[in-house]
């Protein structure tokens, strides 16, 4: 059994390394004393504001269009409770535990910066859920990404209050029972605390981070599978000459070209048709333009990453508590508007779709005997009796086409809510949520390409590919045997897809990617 990692969560110090650790496995988190001091000071500021007996939005008023309705001090706790139960209106399947864990951690680091006005008990309640692996039941649908992720974060908060449901060891149970089982007390929310918990972009950001991690994984595996396809189709490595890419200057293009040069280097298949022996003047774009297309994908993945890392460390609730010369003040703003996350998710969708689109084109090339450098039709002996990879390509085409539709930017849509008080929204939650489905589609496409490219390498009997490509081919053959005649192919596709998703094919050439990503 793997030991659970313990981390001290420093506000504004979340890195991609930490975020990925939290995404991939349970953690035990603590906060430094300095964070608790900031939390305590901010809570005392809220008490000072209440004692002034003046209206302060989010503290002693209603919400949204009801912001001008003053709430008496004796109803402030009821106000917060009513806020949570009335906003717990999500629908759809529950978000998975790893995404919910990211949500809660980012909410903790936001509250711990000391401008949200909550008590330390609120933060400790969240840490109790995280550290005891209690996952609030958060329905996936119901947020428009402004004013924050209100509905899903309300479901999270409901669990802290001992209401609704949670998941423990994969089982759905009453939140009250789970808290009692782990010795945790349900929290009663005080002034400002409910709004601080549900006003924020943490759900959209967590879903976008999942898409970001998947996009990186897909690009890395698609690069080595793309090299495997080049060699299988007897493609040229000349288009990856560093000089071509340096005179254009795009970081991603330069790095992807470098990777292909190194991955193909030393291939006997490539040497067999080098120079005058190579009668193909130019390869189709899906082979020779991989640096230009996949490099552009790398660049926008990096751009999305920069945005998401900032947002992961951000305070995005409203109002926020600051100090003027004459004392504390609650200032209303709009940090809850998740437009940056929506834009980041939209460009990740473009990258994921294009990675799959290029992979589908390489599959089409490999099964086409007029383009594939001497490979048999549909990558199988005795074609006609055997159909080979004919319909596997149809599956890839279907998924690539589906992704193109799903990739339509969600951020260009907006629909007014809350009686037109919240009249422009980001749709960030949808933008980010769809990335998972798109990534699964693209992983399947790359898996099919891996099968096809591996098949092509096997047909070059007597000629070895390069060392890194041989390792990738061997890892494939450990899971899937050579396709010598027609057989039930769906299990092979699923096995290859898992190789794509688990990063197996990308492990042995990690040093070639040392300069790919701007944010660590």
Curated annotation (Swiss-Prot):
It is an enzyme of class 4 (lyase). GO terms for biological process: L-histidine catabolic process to glutamate and formamide; L-histidine catabolic process to glutamate and formate. Its EC number is 4.3.1.3. GO terms for cellular component: cytoplasm. Keywords: Cytoplasm, Histidine metabolism, Lyase. Contains an active site 4-methylidene-imidazol-5-one (MIO), which is formed autocatalytically by cyclization and dehydration of residues Ala-Ser-Gly. It is found in: Cytoplasm. One of its GO terms (molecular function) is histidine ammonia-lyase activity. Pfam families: Lyase_aromatic. Its main location: cytoplasm. The modification 2,3-didehydroalanine (Ser) is found at residue 147. Gene3D superfamilies: Fumarase/aspartase (Central domain), Fumarase/aspartase (N-terminal domain). Pathway: Amino-acid degradation; L-histidine degradation into L-glutamate; N-formimidoyl-L-glutamate from L-histidine: step 1/3. There is a cross-link at residues 146-148 (5-imidazolinone (Ala-Gly)). Belongs to the PAL/histidase family. This is Histidine ammonia-lyase. It comes from Psychrobacter cryohalolentis (strain ATCC BAA-1226 / DSM 17306 / VKM B-2378 / K5). The lineage of its organism: Bacteria, Pseudomonadati, Pseudomonadota, Gammaproteobacteria, Moraxellales.
């Amino acid at each position: 059994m793997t030991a659970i990692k313990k981390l001290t969560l420093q506000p504004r110090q979340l890195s991609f390394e930490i975020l990925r650790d939290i995404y991939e496995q349970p953690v035990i988190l603590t906060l430094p004393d300095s964070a608790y001091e900031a939390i305590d000071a901010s809570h005392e500021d809220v008490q000072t504001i209440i004692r002034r007996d003046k209206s302060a939005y989010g503290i002693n008023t209603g919400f949204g269009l009801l912001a001008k309705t003053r709430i008496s001090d004796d109803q402030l706790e009821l106000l917060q409770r009513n806020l949570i139960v009335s906003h717990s209106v999500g629908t759809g399947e529950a978000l998975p535990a790893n995404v919910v864990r990211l949500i809660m951690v980012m909410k903790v680091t936001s509250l711990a910066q000391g401008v949200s006005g909550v008590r330390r008990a609120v933060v400790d309640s969240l840490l109790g859920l995280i550290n005891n692996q209690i996952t609030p039941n958060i329905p996936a649908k119901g947020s428009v990404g402004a004013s924050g992720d209100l509905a899903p974060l309300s479901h999270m908060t409901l669990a802290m209050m001992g209401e609704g449901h949670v998941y423990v060891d994969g089982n759905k149970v009453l939140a009250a029972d789970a808290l009692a089982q782990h010795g945790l007390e349900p929290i009663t929310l005080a002034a400002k605390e409910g709004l601080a918990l549900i006003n924020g972009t943490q759900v959209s950001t967590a879903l976008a981070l999942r898409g970001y991690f998947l996009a990186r994984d897909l690009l890395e595996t698609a690069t080595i599978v793309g090299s495997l396809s080049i060699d299988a189709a007897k493609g040229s490595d000349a288009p990856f000459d560093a000089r071509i890419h340096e005179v254009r200057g795009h970081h991603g293009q330069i790095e992807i070209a470098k990777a292909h040069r190194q991955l193909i280097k030393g291939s006997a298949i490539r040497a067999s048709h080098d120079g005058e022996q190579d009668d193909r003047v130019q390869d189709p774009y899906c082979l020779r333009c991989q640096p230009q297309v996949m490099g552009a994908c790398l660049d926008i993945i990096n751009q999305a990453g920069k945005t998401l890392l900032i947002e992961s460390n951000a305070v995005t609730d409203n109002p926020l508590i600051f100090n003027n010369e004459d004392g504390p003040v609650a200032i209303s703003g709009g940090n809850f508007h998740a437009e940056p996350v929506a834009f980041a998710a939209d460009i990740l969708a473009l990258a994921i779709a294009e990675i799959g689109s290029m992979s589908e084109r390489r599959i089409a090339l490999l099964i086409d005997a007029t383009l594939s450098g001497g490979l048999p039709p549909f990558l199988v002996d005795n074609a006609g009796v055997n159909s080979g990879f004919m319909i596997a390509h149809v599956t890839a085409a279907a998924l690539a086409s589906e992704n193109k539709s799903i990739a339509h930017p969600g951020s260009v849509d907006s629909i007014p809510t809350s009686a037109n008080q919240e009249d422009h929204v980001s749709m960030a939650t949808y933008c980010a949520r769809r990335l998972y489905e798109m990534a699964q589609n693209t992983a399947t496409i790359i898996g099919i390409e891996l099968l096809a490219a591996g098949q092509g390498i096997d047909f070059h009997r007597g000629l070895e590919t390069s060392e890194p490509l041989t390792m990738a081919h061997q890892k494939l053959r450990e899971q899937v045997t050579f396709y010598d005649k027609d057989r039930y192919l769906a299990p092979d596709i699923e096995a290859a897809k898992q190789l794509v998703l688990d990063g197996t094919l990308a492990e042995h050439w990690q040093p070639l990617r040392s300069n790919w990503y701007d944010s660590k």
